[in-house]
Amino acid sequence: MDIQVSALGAVLALAISIFLIIKKIQPAYALIIGALIGGLIGGANLTDTVTLMMNGAKGMMTAILRILTAGVLAGVLIQSGAATKIAETIISKLGQNRALIALTISTMVLTAVGVFVDVAVITVAPISLEIARKSNITKSAILLAMIGGGKAGNIISPNPNTIAVSENLNVSLTSVMIAGIIPAILGVVITCIISKRLTKKGTYVEAAEVIENNEMTPSFLSAITGPLVSIGLLMLRPIANISIDPLIALPVGGIIGVIAMGKLKKLNEYASFGLSKMTGVAILLIGTGTLAGIISNSALKDVIISGINTLGLPSFALAPISGILMAGATASTTSGAAVASSVFGSTITSLGVSSLATAAMIHAGCTVIDQLPHGSFFHSTGGSINMNMNERLKLIPFEAIVGLTMTIISVSYTHLTLPTTWNV
């Protein structure tokens, strides 16, 4: 396609989208409006601008289909009480003395098995408030522990962001998940270190904020069955060279999980809930696709590459930098991963970086500043433990350190050590 938008148009598309999101316009509409105005200002006529937007949205459709079917597993985990049971078991096994480590690991595990980061934090939040009250730990410490764990789990999970980067760079979902394991482990370590330093900084939990949870939950074995089945099916590719698409593996895990818990009659209810959760993500990705269509056909890539060269950075630095910038612009890991991988992916691989390393570095980069205040994650996580705005804002740099640590490790590990042809 020969339609070209100026770098100014692409930047304005991003800026307008961010401004509208801050003004509480629905993010999908904000992205579409930003893309439209940016394309027109960038020199394309109305017809060409719409064409670019449509083509960008089309590029998201296969990822959207996989994300929608992943709703079966997510719905089962959340609605059946399986996610709560997994978190409670991990925390009880590690004990009160290792409270922050327990919160970090429990949120990481929940996210790693397919629960959204914000939902994982909200799920663990009631338990964290009780622990914080008993251990005299501040809200800042427990929230950072949960968010850091969630960020670590997010880069090794079959979540929408992982699906988006694997699809856009034509590498298997399993490969991207495995490539994130080492960075995720270091992410957990740095989270535990920083959260420990925050135990006496910030506000403490009041007695009235602790809510007892008397909800009946399934056994741990039945709760973990669904995620284990899904991960097992995805792992058949590297183990036995049997490729089972996430489109099949994730819902099958959800179905087997609900059978294991003896709640088959509620499968439709759980699946409907999961679909409702994924629908918002799918719609957001359509809006993201329109923005990606404008940016990918603009001179912005050349400007960023030129800037990297001017700073003397290596060419592969474009991968994590694009992830950081796009996730920060959209305040969303999923949107950032989708835009960065679809817009910059082919350019990065043309510079000699393997598709898998590109996917992993973009993915890790998207965890650095995806928590900015113009996104929903900032507010939903803070609200889960009744944290005030000022205290929540002070956590952003610490969250960024966790994401940046994982990004640096990802660059060191995936680009410098993984074989260029490795794709499992």
Predicted regions and their residues:
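Alpha-helical transmembrane segments of multi-pass membrane proteins
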Residues: 97-110, 135-155, 176-179, 185, ...
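Re-entrant/interfacial helical elements at transmembrane boundaries that shape
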Residues: 72, 85-87, 118-131, 159-169, ...
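Conserved small/polar residues in nucleotide/adenosyl-binding loops
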Residues: 414-420
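Short helix-coil transition sites and intra-membrane helix breaks within transmembrane domains
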Residues: 23-27, 61-63, 74-84, 111-123, ...
